[in-house]
Design a protein with these regions (language model features):
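A short, conserved alpha-helix in the catalytic core of glycosyltransferases
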Residues: 163-214
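Glycine-rich, basic loop-to-helix element that forms the pyrophosphate-binding segment
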Residues: 64-84
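Short beta-strand-to-loop acidic/aromatic patch adjacent to the donor-nucleotide binding site
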Residues: 86-97
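Active-site-adjacent helix/loop segment of glycosyltransferases
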Residues: 207-320, 324, 328, 332
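A recurrent flexible, glycine/aromatic-enriched loop bordering the glycosyltransferase active site
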Residues: 132, 141-146, 152-172, 189, ...
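Conserved donor NDP-sugar-binding/catalytic core segment of glycosyltransferases
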Residues: 96-139
Length: 348
């Protein structure tokens, strides 16, 4: 019997993206009686909702009453998948286009082993389909996260383990979600997929790349004040919730130096107010109450040591859209050297 799949599309002002995305989904080869499509609209101000209602009556639509952010919007879909006994949930960004067999290929990989909790499709750049957007994402030991293989030439790849899957195109096993939980709703947006991938590995689930499952992404790298705040804040949350205490102490010196560097960076870019808001967030007692509560849940479910987890982490930030001489010749060598030293100490 085929596996029942819910394809979840979080949508916000998606009029420019949804026609291509939904049209490509209408051509997929997976049995039509084995999947459903759910669009969760996060209070769009364009005519996205009307477009779906008028053109895609077969698609289930949930419209939020207020803007909840990427993490909670996806969680609405994931909880729907759990409540309605789906075997899988596939998270798909609205700015994507899929190959007809993308779902068949992803499920074929996932079904090989019950310990596979997530499978990412090969994500290619829509406007330059000869280049990769992501073939599995990387985690820097200080919480930075970036797309693996970005801008590399598209080539034949083998199925392999990856550190964490891009939330733009990932198949999640509902059984695994019932164990590790959904996205952390406190994240709002950014790093929620980093955190989930980390927690999957901690709970002894595997995260794999399905190279023959292909999705195209209308990706544009952006720098913004809002993005800076959430990415800085959430990388701290990921570290504080998932590392063991001893590991946090070991990375503390490097984290302090990085904090100083990030403050100067924020000052130069004019985003220093956002950096101060991050500091303010961590001075609030309720913040630490949430962190400790989440941390207890994560550590209670832990089956894998930090010694094993950190083998997947990197000491350099290698992402072409943010490369500069300071990062390449100063920051990366220093922080990578520190990482190579301390990871040999971590035995727990």
């Amino acid at each position: 019997m085929g596996k029942k799949v819910l394809i979840i599309i979080p949508s916000y002002n998606g009029t420019g993206f949804l026609p291509d995305c939904l049209s490509s989904l209408s051509k997929i080869t997976y049995p039509k009686d084995q999947y459903e499509i759910l669009v969760v609209d996060d209070v769009s101000t364009d005519n996205s909702v009307e477009y779906i209602k008028n053109n895609w009556a077969e698609i289930k639509l949930i419209v939020n009453e207020k803007n909840l952010g990427f993490a909670k919007v996806n969680n609405i879909g994931l909880q729907y998948a759990i409540d309605n006994n789906f075997d899988y949930a596939y998270l798909l960004n609205q700015d994507t286009v899929v190959e007809p067999d993308f779902l068949d290929q992803a499920i074929a990989i996932s079904e090989v082993d019950e310990k596979i909790g997530a499978v990412q499709s090969k994500l290619l750049l829509y406007h330059d389909q000869g280049k990769i957007n992501s073939i599995g994402n990387e985690i820097h030991y200080l919480g930075f996260a970036f797309a693996g293989g970005y801008l590399s030439p598209n080539a034949e790849l083998e199925t392999r383990e990856i550190t964490y899957p891009s939330g733009a195109c990932v198949l999640l096993k509902v059984k695994a979600l019932k164990t590790v939980g959904l996205f952390n709703p406190d994240f709002f947006m950014y790093h929620e997929d980093t955190d989930l991938g980390w927690r999957l590995w901690l709970s002894d689930f595997k995260v794999l790349l399905a190279p023959k499952s292909v999705v195209y992404h209308k990706y544009e790298f952006s720098r913004s004040i809002k993005k800076y705040y959430y990415m800085e804040r959430n990388r701290y949350l990921v570290l504080l919730q998932n590392y063991k205490i001893a590991t946090l102490f070991l990375i503390f010196p490097a984290a302090c130096i990085m904090d100083v560097a990030m403050f100067f960076y924020s000052f130069i870019t004019g985003w220093w107010r956002q950096e101060l808001l991050v500091y303010r967030y961590f001075f609030l007692p309720k913040t630490w109450a949430k962190i400790l509560k989440t941390r207890r849940l994560v550590q209670k479910k832990r089956k894998v040591s930090d010694k094993e987890i950190i083998k997947r982490f990197v000491g350099k930030i290698d992402f072409q859209d943010i490369q500069n001489p300071l990062l390449k010749y100063i920051a990366n060598p220093i922080f990578n050297l520190y990482w190579q030293i301390i990871k040999k100490i971590i035995w727990w």
